[in-house]
Amino acid sequence: MINNKNVIEMGLRRINQVIFSIFLLIGGCVAPPDYSDGLLENVPAIVDETDYFSLSLLGDDYSEDKEWELSLMTDSTDTILTTLVLADLSISNTDSSILFMMNDSGDTVFQPILLGNVVWSSDIAVNLIGSPKKISFKGDNFTGRLEYQILKK
């Protein structure tokens, strides 16, 4: 009778341990943050195709230099649509983030200094600036949203 009682107590302890472990595992789980726009903070999102390039950045004191070689295929008869949207910027006097677009000759053909909220777009003939080949972002405490696109028309 004593052995049966010990076996039952050991079984109940084992069941309690399993139940406690399950509650601990379920209760300890943390869901990932809910990003409504899909952007992760300080992680540039890039889409690079033969007819389209997009750079999206949600920066919070972002201070890195990044370069992207473009897959964009253009010839001298093409026109490109370039758009830049800057929003929710928080800039101090010492911040100096810059975006560059370089052509196939290595010349800088677009260089906005990112100082304030802006919505800008322009059609540019490739024969005037050369074929875009590289995008460079020099981040210096960039805080805000940057959306930059190049679309071959």
Predicted segments — roles?
Residues 30-32:
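Bacterial signal peptide processing site
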Residues 80, 141-153:
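C-terminal interaction-tip segments
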